Amino acid sequence: GLGDVYKRQSDCIKKGAIYNLDKTTQCLSAVICQLEETLHASIKKVYVGIGGQSVRSIRHTETKQLTEETKISQALIDAIMESNREITLMDQEILAVEPQEYKLGNNQLTTEPVGIQTDRIEGNFLNIIARNSLKSNIRQCFRQTGYEVAEYLLSPLATANAVLTGSEKRSGCALVDFGADTTTVSVYKNNLLRHLAVIPLGSSNITKDICSL
């Protein structure tokens, strides 16, 4: 279960992105040290959530024409997914891939193509991308703290898995995560993530507007 929570105000991160690496490193070290003191335990590895204004989804399709009717194998699906990850992005990187339906032949759609015979397969993917600097800056800060990153988690996906039920994802819903500097919108339908966007608007904007009245 959750052992403890500690947070610290900082002006070195704006809209989910690090812009002062030294201050962020100091802040991270202070937060983790405080948790170690509170829990009376040594923290060796950390799980890091990634979010921010530059995170968004884009669609991409990979098509494979087969020479004859062939039974689809997991190896073929893996190869198609790998081709999807190799697409060229300008100053962006793929943080996560959410496979959509596969189109077999001319019109058959399925999310489980392995074992089905076809002469053509089209893989549709929802790629979650962000600026290259988003993850690299986080990696650099944790390297300077001396703590090892066990895993990078895409925050919107982790949040959805924590708060949405399977029934909600199947029937269709939008999850709106209203933060201080950004608002993240995740749209689900038929148990699949269909769209992800981060809007540069949060509660701090509302607070500033109220204060200016």
Spans of features found by a protein language model:
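Glycine-rich phosphate-binding loop of actin/hexokinase-like ATP-binding domains
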Residues: 171-212
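Nucleotide/phosphate-binding catalytic cleft detector across ATP-hydrolyzing
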Residues: 1-174, 192-194, 203
